[in-house]
Amino acid sequence: MPLFALLVLVAAAAPAQESAVSLPPFLVEEAAKGPPWRHGEAMGFEILSRCGDSATRRVVEAHFQLHQLLGEMLPPSLRWQSSVPPLLILYDEELQPAASQEVIRQMLRRADAPEPEFGAMPGGRGLRMPSAAPRYSFLPNLRLWDRDGMAIFMIVRRDQVDADRLSLTYDYVNFLVRQRLPLLPAWFVGGLLTLYQKTEYGSGQLTVPAVDWFSPLPTEAQLKDPAVPSPVWSLPEVLQQRLPAPGTTGLPAGADPAKAWQAHAALLVRWGLEADKQAHRAGMWRFIERSAFEGTSEALFRECLGFGYDEARRRLAAFLPVAARRSFRLKPARPAKLPPFPLTNASDLQIACIKGDWERLEVPYVRGISAELAPKYLDQARRTLRRAYDRDHRDPRLLAVMGLCEVDGGDDTAARGFLESAAALGPIRPRASQELGRLRLAEARANPAGANGRIDTNQTVRVLEPLFAARAALPPLPEVYELIAQVWAASDAKPTLRHLAVIDEGVKLFPRRIALVRLAAELYVRDGHREQADAFIELGLRVAEDEPTRAIFSALRAR
């Protein structure tokens, strides 16, 4: 079968004050021999590999071990989750063809880039090139994501697959924490990421660093003296980011308030992980998870941890000297083993769905850093997807990815056909359902069948159908709730409070999504539900970032 050669562009080296532009992998068909793509599923990931089976298994095993270690700091329940399995694409480094550089040069010429004045230089990553010419090199590890999915691409060196030499990047963990819904409490996100920045992997364990404290540490005598103010803030100040006044005991003159809060948040997370022989970990996880749904309160803290804020402050103060002076190690009590998983030759459909989805994700990434090359990436994604489509594959997953590819490429007309066909064949991913709902709403608005230029009940139901399918999947998408609100705003059918409760759900998930808050407030005002409307108006006034937006909510309050 043809070889898909991995090509990675790094744009021309700019003058000294400018940096090169790194572009993601570009997979080009070449008439060369090579091993087949292999397919498998493990630890929730869907795997497409161009490596030998033994290397593939070593990578997946290492991936599994790293996530097991991460679970000691960040359990799966507190990470981003999706109904769409994340993709792991592996490519053997030794399959790089010698002609790769020339292919890239030709593509850059077609994009009107400067013609290099030197020949192809494999391995030229360490060479200093003329400023007018492009440099090319492999990008060995890249993660891209959509609103409902994620994909990881790795170039694998056969002799360097060792979990003790690998780690999960800060960027990856930052994504897992910040994209998790409902949103995790800010103190936990800040504290965990502050610690994770310097956390080290090795020997089957995590080494968590000492807390970088912002002021001199208290002595043992000071900690025991009730006349000496506590060296740590009260729990409400930490949990709710209520910073003490500068120059006070809690915030000495010259201390950075943000760094002081981060230090407290890191101390609280570190205490939850380590203190009293890790006795508080399960309770801390429960408190964090429930806080994301219910909000933070002392009653919840007491229920989960067994004591209140004052006692927690005392314990944090006693723990501070330990946390600020030494690191500590975390490892699973009983290391889990990855269950065996089969690897089989990937079908044309599997290659198209996985590789095409990856290439689709590359397009907006490239558009943001080198817009003139984005059409080349879009063309390649379309070719990959079309290859299976032209062989009469009509799978809902393939059609959904093709539809999203056209949406991202700006062709809603083509996208609509693929998305409708996908939805008719079976369940599709949440973003595909959301985009189908958006396109159906646009059509209904352009051809309203209801009274007074509104869409009628049949149109309303048809638009809501894919939106509610998306709502039932993970992750929740704010656009889904905004579209549901727009449907009710455009419909000649009056929604009940039960219907509107779905929009309430969206606001709880996305309280800072000002467009959604505004739509909710307008609907409740329009339909005479004053109490609920006032709650959304007050929220909008709190989270609005400019005066024109605040003026909109003030006008709603006056209606």
Report residues per predicted region:
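Alpha-helical adaptor scaffolds
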Residues: 404-407, 435-445, 453-458, 468-505
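Acidic/His/Gly-enriched intrinsically disordered linker/tail segments
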Residues: 32-33, 121-152, 180-340
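Non-catalytic architectural context of zinc metalloproteases
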Residues: 16-165, 180, 200, 247-261, ...
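Active-site recognition of the HExxH zinc-binding catalytic motif
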Residues: 44, 166-179, 190-194, 269
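Short coil turns that delineate tetratricopeptide repeat
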Residues: 393, 427, 475-476, 511, ...
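Alpha-helical repeat scaffolds
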Residues: 377-386, 414-422, 451-471, 495-507, ...
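Terminal, low-structured helical/coil segments at or just beyond the last alpha-helical repeat
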Residues: 506, 519-522, 526-559
